[in-house]
């Protein structure tokens, strides 16, 4: 499945409950100069191909001033799972205790995070 880049307005609509339909959504927050973010891209694409029932997005934090504080995370890459609707459920993936040297998050941990949240949605 393709990964769609979204802008600030789209992000705030998804996370703010303006998307009324119920969908499972995963968003990767990245930075243009973040080597871990770029290294994570092929894994993120592969995982999106494995989950046809989930919408995958990417948001460039270079245009997201103030959003880390608003959403309560620090640094990129960061991944979150959202169950959209009038009252969206938003869960951020925890930072790894032992980060993967190349991609920060371990691919298996990302898969488990999505699987667990799809089950709970």
Predicted regions and their residues:
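Local sequence-structure signature of Cys/Sec-based thiol-disulfide redox active-site neighborhoods
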Residues: 13-50
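CheY-like receiver
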Residues: 14-18, 67, 113
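Conserved beta-strand elements of beta-rich interaction domains across eukaryotes
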Residues: 31-33, 63, 84-87
């Amino acid at each position: 499945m393709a990964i769609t880049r979204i802008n600030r307005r789209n992000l705030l609509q998804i996370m703010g409950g303006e998307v009324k339909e119920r969908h499972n959504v995963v968003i990767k927050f990245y930075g243009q100069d973040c080597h871990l973010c770029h290294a994570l891209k092929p894994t993120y694409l592969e995982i999106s191909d494995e989950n046809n029932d989930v919408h995958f997005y990417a948001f460039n934090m270079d245009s997201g001033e103030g959003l880390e504080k608003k959403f309560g995370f620090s640094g990129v890459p960061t991944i979150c799972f959202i169950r959209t609707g009038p009252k969206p459920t938003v869960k951020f993936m925890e930072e790894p205790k032992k980060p993967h040297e190349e991609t920060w998050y371990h691919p298996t941990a990302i898969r488990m995070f999505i699987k667990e949240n799809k089950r709970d949605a």
